[in-house]
Design a protein with these regions (language model features):
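N-terminal (or domain-start) structured segment
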Residues: 23-116, 179-203, 294-296, 317-325
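An extracytoplasmic/periplasmic, membrane-proximal ligand-sensing/linker region
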Residues: 31-33, 264-325
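Ligand-binding pocket segment of bilobal, Venus flytrap-like solute-binding proteins
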Residues: 72, 154, 158-162, 166-238
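C-terminal lobe and pocket-closing loops
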Residues: 125, 211-279, 308-311, 324
Length: 325
């Protein structure tokens, strides 16, 4: 390349870098606050995650304001449809949780396509597990498997709903353990399920580790195993399913998304802000206090995980469509 061409190319690159820096520093349009739609009730895991991380994101972008609104219903479908059909102008963002995000349009008609959203940042990865009462006869996964085989179709388990990460985890577990289907009792979240478990109305709960970790530490519940690759540092005494000889990896991945077609300039700015927020020491400290197992992924990495989830569920749906149970 000639010296003149090198000079022009270098000048163009410098101008592009300057424009990017100015865009990152420019105030966010402040005609109204950014609405962050949480498709689940207040106080749940997705809601808590959103309210914890979003103030740190807005702090990175001058002029940006936000308000979190809860639009729950139909296991997240109502809120996800609102996010999907919002104008891609940066004034509407939302939260979601995989794999329920992918499962909804597979099992029923929905006004959104799971992979068409703009994926901004995943925040939490909370593994599924089996919670039992402290007086349960099941001391480990092997005990539960033996009981399921000895009493086919009699054991009862609770989840946070049909098509939830908990329910899909159970389908994978039954397949891996080669046990007859157990009796599924869906609830509208972990909050109403846990008292029923404590009261002896279900044999065990298939939920996330973080859902009842405080009760485990109080000695009111036990965890048989966690469906993670490694033991979570907040539950180091709980073996993984792989340690029990079962290849079961499942959990809830909670993150932030935008409507389809969010402009690249907006997406890049938000992704950069999330990258900083997810390293913030105050955020890390509070997440630990609230038993939030972090799994930070930004932009394309988050979308790639969502695509893997989509592919896995398509296979599961063909093998065992869960809307029937």
């Amino acid at each position: 390349m000639s010296g003149r061409r090198q000079f022009l190319a270098g000048g163009a690159a410098a101008c592009a870098a300057t424009r990017l820096a100015r865009a990152q520093a420019a105030p966010w349009p402040s005609e109204r606050p950014v609405e962050v739609i949480v498709p689940f009730p207040a106080g749940g895991g997705v809601d808590v995650m959103s309210r914890l991380v979003m103030p740190l994101v807005t702090a990175q972008i001058p002029g940006m304001r936000h308000v979190v609104t809860n639009r729950s219903g139909a296991a997240g479908q109502i809120g996800l449809e609102a996010i999907f059909n919002a104008a891609p102008d940066g004034y509407t963002l939302g939260a979601t949780t995989l794999p329920a995000h992918n499962a909804i349009p597979m099992e029923r008609a929905a006004r959104f396509r799971a992979m068409d959203f703009t994926f901004l940042a995943n925040v939490v990865g909370d593994a599924n597990c089996f919670y039992v009462r402290t007086d349960s006869p099941f001391r480990n996964v092997a005990d539960l498997v033996a009981a399921a085989r000895a009493r086919p179709g009699q054991l009862t388990y609770g989840t946070t709903g049909v098509g939830s990460d908990d329910h899909l985890f159970m389908l994978n577990f039954e397949q891996a353990a080669q046990v007859p289907p157990m009796v599924h009792i869906p609830f509208a979240g972990a909050a109403p399920l846990i008292p029923q478990l404590l009261g002896g109305h279900v044999d065990f709960a298939a939920i996330n580790v973080g859902d009842a970790l405080a009760m485990k530490r109080e000695g009111r519940l036990r965890i048989l195993a966690q469906a993670a690759e490694t033991r979570w540092e907040e539950a180091p005494d709980v073996p993984t399913f792989r340690e029990a000889g079962l290849d079961v990896l499942n959990g809830a991945e909670r993150g932030l998304i935008g409507p389809p077609g969010l402009p690249e300039a907006i997406t890049a700015r938000l992704s950069a802000a999330f990258a900083v927020a997810l390293r913030d020491t105050d955020f890390l400290r509070e997440a630990k206090r609230q038993f939030m197992p972090l799994h930070p992924l930004v932009g394309s990495d988050y979308r790639a995980m969502a695509q893997r989830t989509e592919d896995q569920l398509q296979v599961l749906w063909q093998r065992r469509p869960w809307r029937e149970r």
